[in-house]
Amino acid sequence: MDCNRMVIMNSVNEETYYFGQRKLAWFAGSMKKDYIEAGSWDDKAKAVPYSVYREFALNPAPIGKTLGISEKGDPIWVDIPPKTKHQLITEAEDKKSGLMQGAREVISPLQDAIDLEMATQEETQKLTAWKRYRVLLNRLDTSNAPDIDWPKKPE
C-alpha cells in the first residue's frame, strides 16, 4: 500500500499519525511542533492511514518479525536479523552473572551455618554442591556463546 497519497484521520480522535522512516518511530500529528522543538522529529516522517498505524504501532509484531521499512518508505514487518556474536556473548555473560548471584545467595546462609558449627549434614552437602556449581559457572567461557554447556543447578 502506498501511503504517500493517503492521510486518513482516526474517526475517534481525529489524529493524524506519521511514520518516521529514519527512526522507525511513530509520531502523533498533534504533537509535531513539540517533536520539532525537542529535536526528535524525523524529517522523513510521512502521514499514514490509521489502519496502517493500528496494524504496525498498536499490535505486536508477528513472531519472528520486527518493524522495518519498504522501498517506498512504508512500514512493513521484516524478519528479525540473527543475533551478532557480540550480542550472544553479552547475553551469556548476563546469564552467567545472574546464575553466579543466585548461587551466592544460596551459599551465604549455608556457609554461615558451617562457620557457626550449626550446619546439619544436609546443609553441608548442599553447600558442597552449590560451591561446585559456582566453580563450574565461573570456569565457563562465554566467548563460546551460544554453544555453552551450562552446569546443572543443584537441587
Swiss-Prot record:
Signal peptide: none
Record family assignment: Belongs to the tfa family.
Protein keywords: Chaperone, Viral release from host cell, Viral tail assembly, Viral tail fiber assembly
Biological role: Chaperone involved in tail fiber assembly.
Example of a GO biological process term: virus tail fiber assembly
Pfam families recorded: Caudo_TAP (PF02413)
Protein name: Probable tail fiber assembly protein
Chaperone found in the keyword field: yes
InterPro entries for the chain: Phage_T4_Gp38_tail_assem, TFA_Chaperone
